[in-house]
C-alpha cells in the first residue's frame, strides 16, 4: 500500500525536532529528519528540462517517476504516513500527490540567530565557533545565513508565498514557533485535521528525543545537543534580542522576516514594523 507522504519545510531552530519528537509517538505518522529525498526527486525533475526533450510531452512520465521514487524511498517503513523534511520546492511537490500538503515552520529571524548563539555558547565544540573564531554576532549571523541553512530556508518559505499568490494546487499550513511551543496541543490537533489522518493521544509532558526508524541524531560533527529536546513540559525559548543584537544589526537583518512571514502575518504579529 502506498504511503501518505507530506512535506515539511521552514526555518532552522523553529521547532522541527520538537514537532518530530511529538508526532513520532504515533507509529502511524512519522516526521523524518532532514532528508535527501527532496534533492533526489528534484534532480529527476531537472532531468526533464532541456531542448532535447521539448518536442514531446513527458509530463505524465515525469509525474509517475517522481511519485514512484518517493514511494520506493519509504517502501520498507512500517508507518502509514510520513512527513518528509527537506528542500521541497512547489514545482516538485505538486507532482507527488493529487492533494499535496506542505507544513511550513516559521520563526522570527532574530530568534533563529539567538537560538543558534545560545546553543553554541552552551556547547563549546560546535560548527559555528569552529568557523567563526571572532564569535561576534555580526560574523555569526553572516556565517549562519550562508552555511546554517538560514537564508535558504527563508527563501524557500518566500517561494511558497509567491507560488500561492497565483496557484491553489498545494495546501499549506503555517506553524509559528511561538504557537507550536505555547499552544502545542491545539497546534497538533490542527495539524492532524490539516493532514486528514487519524488523531493520536500524544503525551505532551514527557517528550523523548527525536527518533526515526530506531535512529537518533548523531550530532558529533556539528556539536553536542544541537537536536536535544528539553525534558519536562514544553516551554517557549525566549531571548533578549535588543541586548544580543545592536541596532545596526537589527536594521540590517529585519527585512528577512518579509521572506519568512506573509504580509498578513507580519501585520498581525509585528505591527510595529511598517511596510
Regions found by a protein language model. Give the residues of each.
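PAPS-dependent sulfotransferase catalytic core
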Residues: 1-72, 76
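PAPS-dependent sulfotransferases, especially Golgi type II membrane carbohydrate sulfotransferases
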Residues: 1-2, 165, 193-275
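Hydrophobic/aromatic beta-strand patches that form the interior of the parallel beta-sheet core
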Residues: 6, 30, 101-103, 173-175
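PAPS/PAP-binding and catalytic site of the sulfotransferase fold
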Residues: 15-29, 97, 174-199, 234
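Short catalytic/ligand-binding loop motif for oxyanion handling, primarily in non-cytosolic enzymes
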Residues: 17-20, 38-42, 90-93, 110-115, ...
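Glycine-rich phosphate-binding loop used to anchor ATP phosphates in small-molecule kinases
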Residues: 69-95
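PAPS-dependent sulfotransferase catalytic domain
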Residues: 70, 114-194
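Conserved phosphate-donor/acceptor-positioning beta-strand/loop module used by diverse small-molecule
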Residues: 85, 96-119
Amino acid at each position: 500500500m502506498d504511503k501518505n507522504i507530506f512535506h515539511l519545510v521552514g526555518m532552522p531552530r523553529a521547532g522541527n525536532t520538537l514537532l518530530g519528537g511529538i508526532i513520532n509517538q504515533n507509529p502511524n505518522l512519522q516526521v523524518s529528519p532532514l532528508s535527501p529525498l527532496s534533492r533526489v526527486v528534484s534532480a529527476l525533475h531537472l532531468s526533464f528540462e532541456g531542448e532535447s526533450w521539448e518536442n514531446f510531452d513527458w509530463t505524465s512520465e515525469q509525474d509517475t517517476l517522481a511519485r514512484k521514487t518517493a514511494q520506493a524511498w519509504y517502501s520498507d517503513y512500517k508507518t502509514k504516513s510520513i512527513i518528509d523534511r527537506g528542500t521541497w520546492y512547489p514545482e516538485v511537490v505538486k507532482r507527488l500527490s493529487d492533494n499535496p500538503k506542505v507544513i511550513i515552520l516559521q520563526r522570527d529571524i532574530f530568534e533563529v540567530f539567538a537560538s543558534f548563539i545560545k546553543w553554541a555558547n552552551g556547547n563549546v565544540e560546535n560548527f559555528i565557533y569552529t568557523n567563526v573564531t571572532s564569535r561576534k554576532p555580526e560574523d555569526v549571523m553572516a556565517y549562519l545565513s550562508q552555511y546554517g541553512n538560514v537564508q535558504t530556508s527563508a527563501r524557500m518559505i518566500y517561494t511558497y508565498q509567491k507560488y500561492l499568490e497565483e496557484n491553489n494546487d498545494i495546501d499549506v499550513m503555517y506553524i509559528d514557533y511561538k504557537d507550536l511551543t505555547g499552544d502545542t496541543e491545539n497546534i497538533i490537533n490542527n495539524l492532524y485535521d490539516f493532514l486528514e489522518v487519524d488523531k493520536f493521544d500524544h503525551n505532551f509532558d514527557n517528550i523523548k528525543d527525536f527518533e526515526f526508524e530506531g535512529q537518533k541524531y548523531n550530532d558529533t560533527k556539528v556539536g553536542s545537543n544541537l537536536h536535544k529536546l528539553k525534558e519536562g513540559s514544553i516551554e517557549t525559548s525566549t531571548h533578549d534580542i535588543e541586548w544580543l543584537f545592536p541596532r545596526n544589526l537589527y536594521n540590517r537583518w529585519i527585512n528577512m522576516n518579509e521572506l519568512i512571514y506573509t504580509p498578513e502575518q507580519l501585520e498581525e504579529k509585528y505591527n510595529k514594523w511598517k511596510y
